[in-house]
C-alpha cells in the first residue's frame, strides 16, 4: 500500500469529491442567491 499509484488515486478521488462538493454548495447553498437566471431575464 505504499506505492505511488495508491497515493495518486487517493489524491484524484479527493480532488473529484472536493470539486463536486463545492459545485453543489455553490448551486444550492447560500451563494446561489447571487446567481442570475437567464431564462427569467428574457420573458417573452
UniProtKB/Swiss-Prot annotation:
Family membership: Belongs to the PsbN family.
Cellular component, GO, one term: chloroplast thylakoid membrane
Topology in membrane: Single-pass membrane protein
Cysteines engaged in disulfide bonds, as pairs: none
Biological processes, Gene Ontology terms: photosynthesis
Keywords: Chloroplast, Membrane, Plastid, Thylakoid, Transmembrane, Transmembrane helix
Sections of the chain in a coiled coil: none
Protein's name in the database: Protein PsbN
Subcellular location: Plastid, Chloroplast thylakoid membrane
Residues annotated as transmembrane: 6-26
Role played: May play a role in photosystem I and II biogenesis.
Pfam families named among the record's database cross-references: PsbN
Amino acid at each position: 500500500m505504499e506505492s505511488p499509484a495508491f497515493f495518486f488515486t487517493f489524491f484524484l478521488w479527493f480532488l473529484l469529491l472536493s470539486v463536486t462538493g463545492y459545485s453543489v454548495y455553490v448551486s444550492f447553498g447560500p451563494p446561489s442567491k447571487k446567481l442570475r437566471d437567464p431564462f427569467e431575464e428574457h420573458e417573452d
